[in-house]
Regions:
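Glycine-rich active-site loops that engage anionic ligands at enzyme catalytic sites
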Residues: 2-177
Length: 177
């Protein structure tokens, strides 16, 4: 939308912005009713920083997993790469700064924490968050023309802990044949 101030009054601009805000609020409200449960394997072979995060937070691995899975998160923003959603807020006990040395490659599906947020890496990218687990499958569907992200602003997300065997079974089931 382009507004030319010489052709429109302040009152008209205010009315237009009010309408736009009302529409965006309705859209956000309808999205906020959507929720998704994401299975995550918190096995140390997939949660590359699980042990170090446990040590840094003075929580056992089980307490760390419980803290991460025990709440509903809200998608606060998206960005960095398509399908990358910033979820908040994490349990105060697992708030940590980003890693001192970012990784050049974070595997797709990695679930990570930093500061007061958690994320799922939609594809392999560099990253500086603490990796505590990995979801099987993909958080995005790559089509020829577009990327369909499963997470959008306002959605509610909950993580569910799964075993390494369940992770492998889901990966095998979803593998292209």
């Amino acid at each position: 939308m382009v507004i030319q101030p010489e052709l429109i009054s302040i009152d008209q601009i205010s009315d237009i912005l009010g309408d736009v805000f009302a529409e965006s609020t309705c859209a956000a409200d309808s999205e906020s009713d959507l929720s998704i449960e994401i299975p995550v394997c918190y096995d140390p072979c997939l949660g590359l920083d699980l042990k170090s995060v446990s040590d840094l937070t003075d929580l056992s691995v089980e307490e760390l997993i419980d803290a991460h899975c025990s709440r509903d998160y809200r998608v606060l923003a998206t960005g960095f790469v398509p399908g990358f959603a910033y979820l908040g807020e994490t349990d105060q006990r697992i708030h940590l700064p980003r890693r001192h040395e970012p990784r050049t490659r974070v595997p797709a599906g990695s679930v990570a924490i930093a500061e007061n947020q958690t994320v799922v890496y939609p594809r392999e990218t560099p990253g500086g968050w603490h990796i505590i687990g990995r979801m099987p499958g993909s958080i995005v569907s790559l089509g020829e023309q577009s990327i369909d992200a499963k997470l959008s602003i306002g959605m509610s997300v909950r993580f569910k802990s799964i075993s390494i065997d369940e992770f492998s079974q889901i990966e095998e089931t979803n593998a292209p044949h």
